[in-house]
């Protein structure tokens, strides 16, 4: 089986090499065309520090923690172009193949994780999937897209506010992965109607989507214990049971958004939708059918979100300003005395407490000249300030993450904020891109990601360092011992 996967990957790689980076298109008559593109990517990541705290397994600095191989192939076919009498109709297909090799030929510690839990790890380390598959219909003010797809309604990067429709895959790199690369496409029907110009509002558009819950829901995967990017925690002492949402209409993802441009500058949107939390909620259950009569149940809960976003260009400052606000109705939280009363001598099954949460972001994007470091290209800067506020805060509220070494739960503050900054520029006619990304938590943690990317068409090479410093019980600092250096090679065709 291992040899088969290696052979498949090498075969795809050689196919891409023979294509020499060129997309190809096949025309069908005068109206349609078919285009096939893709990429093959391999990444190796090495841990730069020793394992600390509850991180398992123990891995010394310099050891490999990731060897991810990814291949995608996309097909886009335009069947008809829009005319006065005919609609535009096209479809899109994308296949994705993923294989993580660290469990097969990585450090012994990760090979031992696989041997201890072969069924779970063997299923986790590879994926062959019809990643995207949808059809588009466009006629006048109407647009419909039906199929497996991504949908993003937010203005934010790095962290999500309104952009929580699709589940995220945090198991193959966690916070070190780009947000766009973590979204998991889901089956949905999506429609838009453009009302045109109404008063001072232009391009007033109503949009809605529905991801049916009675047909089975896609949820954010849960990282197995011992995987490189799982949150640090002591080994489980009771059975852990993961429960996906029931197949009911009530568990559908669905929402509506209205957006438009005011005075030809202010892009404004209002939205409301229901989605499924990416992190399952934990309760301790008293169950006589399991050994010891105690189990930990993890359940994916639904949440409704109401929010707004706006962006506009300020000519005097040559800057784009962005803002977004979201109200999360009855979001699950973790209060040990309620979720896990058995830990306090009260042997009854726990419950999931909920509260409303306000989250917002203010940011700006600016391009400027700094000729001291770059005479030919501008510097790109993207700044964001994030904040969240728990309205019905309980002083007992915690994060479901254990603090080392005694295992008490980490504090969840009523008000928390973070700053993000991304700066980049280009050299060598746009083929060399250095970038620095920062995430700062005022409570005492900093994540910094310097990287450099060079393209030699059809190849793209990237070298990045993922560093974390500060307190190990504060947001990004929880993964403080996961610092790594990564090298990635991508072949596009």
Name each region found by the language model.
Residues 24-36, 76-91, 138-141, 145, ...:
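Short loop/turn motifs that connect adjacent beta-strands in outer-membrane beta-barrel proteins
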Residues 27-55, 89-97, 101:
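Transmembrane beta-strand segments of Gram-negative outer membrane beta-barrel proteins
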Residues 32, 46, 63-71, 126-131, ...:
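Residues that define the transmembrane beta-barrel architecture of outer-membrane proteins
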Residues 42-48, 95-101, 139-141, 150-152, ...:
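Transmembrane beta-strands of outer-membrane beta-barrel pores
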Residues 71-77, 93, 132-137, 189-193, ...:
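Residues on the lipid-exposed face of transmembrane beta-strands in outer-membrane beta-barrel proteins
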Residues 82, 86, 273-275, 322-332, ...:
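Detector for outer-membrane/organellar transmembrane beta-barrel domains
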Residues 83-227, 466-471:
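Outer membrane beta-barrel
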Residues 479-493:
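Outer-membrane beta-barrel "beta-signal"
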């Amino acid at each position: 089986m291992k040899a088969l996967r290696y052979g498949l990957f090498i075969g795809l790689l050689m196919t891409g090499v023979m294509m020499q980076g060129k997309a190809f298109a096949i025309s069908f008559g005068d109206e349609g065309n078919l285009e096939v593109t893709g990429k093959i990517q391999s990444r190796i990541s090495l841990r730069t520090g020793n394992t600390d705290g509850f991180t398992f397994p123990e891995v010394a600095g310099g050891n490999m923690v990731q060897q991810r191989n990814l291949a995608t192939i996309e097909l886009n076919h335009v069947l008809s172009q829009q005319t006065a009498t005919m609609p535009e109709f096209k479809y899109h297909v994308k296949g994705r193949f993923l294989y993580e090799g660290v469990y097969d030929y990585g450090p012994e510690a990760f090979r031992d994780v696989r041997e201890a839990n072969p069924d779970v790890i063997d299923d986790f380390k590879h994926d062959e999937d019809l990643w995207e598959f949808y059809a588009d219909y466009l006629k006048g003010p109407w647009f419909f897209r039906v199929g497996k797809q991504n949908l993003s309604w937010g203005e934010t990067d790095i962290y999500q506010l309104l952009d929580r429709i699709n589940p995220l895959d945090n198991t193959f790199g966690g916070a070190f992965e780009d947000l766009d690369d973590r979204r998991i496409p889901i089956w949905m029907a999506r429609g838009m109607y453009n009302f045109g110009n109404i008063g001072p509002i232009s391009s007033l558009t109503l949009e809605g989507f529905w991801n049916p819950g009675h047909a089975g829901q896609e949820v954010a995967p849960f990282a197995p214990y011992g995987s490189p990017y799982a949150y640090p925690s002591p080994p489980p002492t009771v059975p852990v049971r993961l429960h996906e949402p029931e197949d009911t209409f009530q568990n559908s993802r669905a929402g509506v958004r209205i957006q438009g441009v005011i005075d030809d500058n202010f892009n404004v949107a209002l939205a409301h939708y229901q989605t499924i939390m990416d992190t399952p909620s934990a309760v301790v259950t008293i169950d006589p059918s399991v050994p010891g009569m105690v189990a930990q149940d993890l359940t994916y809960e639904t949440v409704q979100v109401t929010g707004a976003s706006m962006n506009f260009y300020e000519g005097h400052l040559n800057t784009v300003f962005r803002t977004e606000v979201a109200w999360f109705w009855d979001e699950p939280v973790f209060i040990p005395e309620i979720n896990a009363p058995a830990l306090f001598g009260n042997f009854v099954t726990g419950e999931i407490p909920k509260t409303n949460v306000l989250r917002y972001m203010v940011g700006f994007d600016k391009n400027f000249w700094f000729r001291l470091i770059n005479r030919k290209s501008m510097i790109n800067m993207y700044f964001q300030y994030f904040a969240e506020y728990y309205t019905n805060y309980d002083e007992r509220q915690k994060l479901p993450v254990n603090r080392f070494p005694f295992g008490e739960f980490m504090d969840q503050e009523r008000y928390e904020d973070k700053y993000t900054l991304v700066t980049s520029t280009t050299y060598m006619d746009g083929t060399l891109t250095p970038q620095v990304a920062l995430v700062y938590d005022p409570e005492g943690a900093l994540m910094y990601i310097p990287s450099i990317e060079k393209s030699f068409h059809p190849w793209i090479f990237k070298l990045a360092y993922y560093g974390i410093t500060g307190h190990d019980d504060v947001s990004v600092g929880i993964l403080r011992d996961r610092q790594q250096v990564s090298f990635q090679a991508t072949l596009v065709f």
